[in-house]
Amino acid sequence: MKIIMLGAPGAGKGTQAKMIAEKYNIPHISTGDIFRANIKNGTELGMKAKSFMDKGELVPDELTVSMLLDRVGQPDCKDGYVLDGFPRTIPQAEELDRALSGRNEKIDFAIDVDVSDENIVKRMSGRRACLKCGATYHMEHIPPKKEGICDSCGSELVLRDDDKAETVLKRLQVYHDQTQPLIDFYTRKGILKTVDGTQDMKDVFAAIVEILV
């Protein structure tokens, strides 16, 4: 079972990807992890990727797909995997399709965790973090016992720049411009499944499991 997770930043697709991986005993694969592993191990592909990253340039799609193919060719992927964070664009999706078809493989499901922009802004701008111990809170869902103070170490809680409404809106615009077309791409292939990401985390997961049965 080969699965791609789609959804805007803050939709919760990473959390769902981990839960799927755990339930079905398949790897949860993110491109960030692949880059870090290849660079740490000093692989040829990793060093090529690092040369682009060091210059502040995007790693070419062919290189990313090559690293991804190397990862999904490992023994722990024989029963499938969950891809999180790739593909992000149509060219990446096409490159991935070409590479997989060369191995007589294909993606089985593309799952879109659907949450409105308004909900995502509310979700993310409600986050607070402790810069001292790293603990995270949400003013609505997981509030600290004392407002603005970390339960664990008593330090001040802050709203990270990444979680500020204007930053979130910019990230959402990039998502809609680049990644939204993937919804149409996988719809045409007949493998797109959409779940309501505004539900409780467990309910979202139950809806995904129902799709995968």
Residue spans for each PLM region:
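Glycine-rich phosphate-binding loop of ATP-dependent small-molecule kinases
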Residues: 1-213
